[in-house]
């Protein structure tokens, strides 16, 4: 019984040890994707111009807006093309990233 508990504890610790680097790597990839948005929407989604800020944007709203750009339902100058370059997972990751950024 003790051997099973020790094995389970060791396995649990190993899972937790490997989970943190994966999350950090995912965040790094998302920041890389978000850097593409910075050209128009500002660093970390905080726009200084007339273009909408993405910082603090609701996750669901971000995903819906990107879907509307993809489908052509929402008018755009460039976003209808850019939105097609991201997978659904990448859009969800960007939505979470920008939602976590403080509004200006």
Task: For the regions a language model picked out, list residue spans one by one.
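Bacterial N-terminal signal peptides that target proteins for export
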Residues: 1-9
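Bacterial N-terminal signal peptides
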Residues: 8-17
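Electrostatic cytochrome c docking/interface patches
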Residues: 16-34, 50-52, 63, 68, ...
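Residues in well-ordered alpha-helical elements
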Residues: 28, 60, 89-92
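The canonical Cys-X-X-Cys-His
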Residues: 35-43, 94
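Detector for the c-type heme attachment site
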Residues: 40-47, 99-100
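Gly/Gly-Pro-rich "capping" loops immediately C-terminal to redox-active cysteine motifs
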Residues: 44-75, 80-84
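C-terminal capping alpha-helices of c-type cytochrome domains
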Residues: 71, 84-104
